[in-house]
Amino acid sequence: MKNLFIYALFLVSILGFSQAEASHWYFGDGAGIIFDLETGTVTSTNAAQNTIDTFEGCSSISDFNGNLLFYTDGRNVWDKNYSIMPNANYSLGTGLMGDPSSTSSGLIVPKPGNPNEYYVFTVDEPHHQNSFAFPNQGPADEFGISTEFYTNPFGSVPEDDDGFNNGLAYSLVDLTLNNGNGDVVTSEKNIQLLTYNPNEQEEESYKCAEKITAVEHSDKQSYWVITHFIDNFYAFRVDSNGVETTPVITNINPLISTSGYRRNGIGYIKASPDGSKIAICHSQNGNQAGGDSDNGSTWIYDFDNSSGILSNPLNLVSNVSQYGVEFSPDSSKLYTSGGGTVLQFDLDAVNPELSFFELAFGFSFFGALQLGPDGKIYVANNEDPFSLDVINFPNELGVDAGYNAYQMNLSSGSSGLGLPPFIQSFFLASIQFENSCVDINTEFSVNSTQAYDSILWDFGDGTDTSTENAPSHTYTSAGTYTVSAEITAGTEVSTFSETIIISSNPIANLADDIDICDDDNDGVMSFDFVAPQTQVLAEQDPTEFTVSYHLSQDDADTNSGALSLPYQ
């Protein structure tokens, strides 16, 4: 053995900065919960804050200190004072194009580079009686004859629906309008996006599924907003210039029929917090307009958050009604709801579709699954709409995940099927640092999904500070240090910290020479370098260091071309 390289990489997750944007949840019939990230408490909202009534779709957003900014049911937008914004009031004819009966009627995405502007993406309910009337205003019967009321469920225009399937659209909220309470910008309101073939009338009459999710782009300066229709995924990029209206389209299994799309379009879509996966639930794949079927499914895909392309479809659940889906904070587990069960899938298993665990079973319908800023997953359970079930340790397998029914009491209001979705990357805030040894440059960076104006680092050793986004610092003594980062965005200042351990430089001790003999004279000799590892590390903790072997000093210096073990 001639060459040895020891390499250590540390990634420390923190609770702060990005997660705080998901601090306020408003959903159901006057229900809501608030996360206090400083104390770790979760409380139900009071009666004065109960200003929403939606059975499914909803979305909310806070600033990076956890202060409420606004929330929506996809039609109305309420400001931080719980008042409907003037240019987003459905009953007054100024509403948005979502629907409270759409699975994900709204999703709020910050406009990169502008802390005062947010996009509200809306997805309408694709109603078959609007499709029957297309291109005219619904409702209509199956023969296209106009009717006064909807029959499934009962309702009328304009009180319950505008008579059109509006598909995916977006509107811009400017928080500087309306005396600083925010309002929708008229020139960027209800901008419809193309998620269908305009040459196919039936596609155009439905336009889009009730599904929408968002995740950070690999450049960390923009987002992907993703939806689905029939057998296509549509990924729209949002950057500092606005919404790119030409999507990245991935045509991939399964094919969901438009024949029963009123029900076929139901179900959640979620991106994993690390941006590597997309999971989607299809409530059913029936062929009767407005009819029910039991042939639902859940699928998971690899996602390239550089290109926006999905690949490698894997069917996890078949022939069962599916509704909610959510990833664990570390993206290693997937949870699904529907058909009276909540299931957990181990995505690290060789065959994830075979590695599942039933966490909950009920005679009613389990609704949305939503990851919270406290790292727990909250579950809408129709059996008791005055509370939420909680998965307390979603990174853990099986019973260790800690499923607890009725854990989160809703002191006012009740839940429906929906809970507010967020940009999944909000739940992946972290300080990253490489090289935690004495007399070696330790490289720091902060993973943030929101633009900021400045950052001030304090490395905790009483020496210097830095205002660089990705600074390096050299510690001269081993020990435990508290590193803090003070981030300024506009007038808001947020400080968070993390404890790191700086170790003495690792020592690669020379192991004994290895004598190898080609006993069977076949020209192949095996080298087992695992056994000498004890000699290489000596008294150093093998759980803290990785030993790798290389054919050249250059490879060792660049930590490339590590030999696989055993080596032949």
Residue ranges of each PLM-predicted region?
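Extracellular/lumenal mature domains of secreted and surface-exposed proteins
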Residues: 424-507
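Acidic, glycine-anchored loop motifs typical of Ca2+
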Residues: 462-463, 515-525
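Solvent-exposed loop segments of extracellular immunoglobulin-like
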Residues: 449-456, 531, 535-551
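Bacterial Sec-dependent N-terminal signal peptides
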Residues: 1-24, 321-323, 427-428, 437, ...
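Surface-exposed, flexible coil segments in extracellular/virion-facing regions
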Residues: 454-473, 541, 550-568
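Short beta-strand segments of immunoglobulin-like
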Residues: 431-437, 512-519
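A short beta-strand segment in extracellular, disulfide-stabilized domains
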Residues: 439-448, 522-535
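Beta-propeller fold recognition
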Residues: 19-432
